[in-house]
Each structure stands twice: as C-alpha cells, then as structure tokens.
Amino acid sequence: MTQSFQVGDLEVKGFSDGILKTSIDFVVGMDRAQSEGLVGGTDNGALFIPVNNFLFEKDGKIIMIDAGAGNTMQPTLGKLPGNLRAAGIDPSAIDYIVITHIHPDHANGLVDDAGAAIYPNAEILVHAQEFDFWMAESDGATPVKVRNTRARNRINMKPYMERVRRMRDGDEVLGCTPMLAPGHSPGHTVWRIGTGRKAFVAWGDLVHFSAIQISHPQTAVTYDLDPDMARQSRLRMLDMVANEKLAVAGAHVNEPGFGYLSRKGSGYSFEPAA
Ligand SMILES: [Zn+2]
C-alpha cells in the first residue's frame, strides 16, 4: 500500500525501491556497542535500510524524488517502477525527477538494463555542482570509487542529456528549490519543496542510518566522500529543519520515511507523520 502525507496543498506519496543491505561497520566515530544499541542489535553487523522515493503532483505535473537503484545493486532493490505501476502511475507519465545526488541507489534506476530511459518524458532537476562533478572526466588522480560512479553516471544520464536542468541555490521549478548540502557527495542537495512553512525537505542522504544519525548527528558514514563536510551540512540542515518545523522526506529514514524533527538532548528525534 502506498503511504501518503499532506504538506500544505501537496499530497506526497512514498514509493519504495526496496531494501538495501549495508553494514554497521560503515559508521564513523561511534563505538560499536553504542551503534549496535541504537539500531537494536544486528546479526554480524548487517544493517537493512529502506530506499525511499517520493512523488507528488503540482500544477498538473507529476514530480518524483530520486529514481532508485534499478537492477544494479542487490536483488532486494529496483522495485520502484513496479510499485509505481501498481499504484496506477505509468513511468512515462512522470514529468520531472528531482535528484538529491547522483549515487547508485538514487540514479541507477533512471535507465533499464539496456540503458534506455525508464522515464522517457521526465526532465531531470539536479544541482549544477552535483551534475558537473559526476559528469567530469576522470584522470590518474581520481579515486577508484569516484571513477566508477562517474562511468556509471554517463550511462544513467545518457538518454536524459537533452533534458537536464542544472539548478543552483535559489532557483525554483514548481516549488522545488535546491539547497546545497555537500559532503556525502560534492553537490549533495536538500530540496525544499512547497511554499513557506507549508513545505517539506527531501534530504537525500543527509541522514544515512536514521536510527543513529538523527539522535547523533555528529556521526558520519564511510559512504560520505567528505565525512567532515557531510557532518557540517547535516548539523546545519537539521537545525534549520527543526527551527522551521519543516516536514521531512528521507531517502533512508525508516518507515514511513517522512515526519518531523524535534530537538532531543544534543540531537533530534523523529516523529513519523501519521
Ligand atoms: Zn543513498
């Protein structure tokens, strides 16, 4: 069943791409006993996190946030197109895809196994800083992780190249405004969507392990290309979200993936939307 929440005049629906198996070993700067305790224990460190996508309509257009992993990562992922169809939404009906960052679990699902667009009519909204970094040429000094993701991102973006809108902070399309929150990736973006206080943020991977990083926002993960910068972005953005009482749609926040932050101790707690 599709879950939805209301933010002002927007009805935001959550669509799962599936479950990503990861590891508590990827937590940086917290001892193992504490991180195990926060997630309620693991079997040999295995941690299972959701890959959430969101969709809403505005002015007769259908806008989706991120595109899932496709068939490229784990068999438990790549469920997004099927879940859209099950809800009566043909992927060809999607007009815009807002991208938080161009990592495999958010962008590899843009294309099918043959490299054809799964969303043939969608325009991509992405921060220029993120797009330019991943579309740049690699050289001998480029870390392997970056080189591989760049190579894959050429495949992801190829059928969309004529309809990519490179945006910067302050730009707006249908109420969607990017706010640079770098660190996890160089142009990682928190999108503010809606009007005034009747807005929500799609915060991408600002928080990767929600059971740990919302209550302990100083804690980074090895997925962050620059963990210190990611930490600063997280602290700054969580503060803003809590101050403004904005609703949150989190790419890897445990079910239902959306809700509100409140301050608790030196961190925050997450109240799921009803
Ligand atoms: Zn992610």
Where do the protein language model's features map onto the residues?
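Conserved beta-strand hairpin/beta-sheet module of binuclear metal-dependent hydrolase folds
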Residues: 2-87, 190-205
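Active-site metal-binding loops of divalent metal-dependent hydrolases
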Residues: 17-19, 67-70, 102, 129-130, ...
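A short acidic, glycine-rich active-site loop
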Residues: 37-47, 88, 150, 221-234
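Residue-level marker for buried hydrophobic side chains located in beta-strands
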Residues: 63-65, 98, 124, 200-202, ...
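Active-site metal-binding motif and surrounding structural segment of the metallo-beta-lactamase
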Residues: 75-125
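Metallo-beta-lactamase
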Residues: 78, 85-86, 93, 120-180, ...
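Histidine-centered catalytic micro-motifs
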Residues: 97-107, 181-188, 249-256
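Cap/insert and terminal regions of metallo-dependent hydrolase folds
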Residues: 196-274
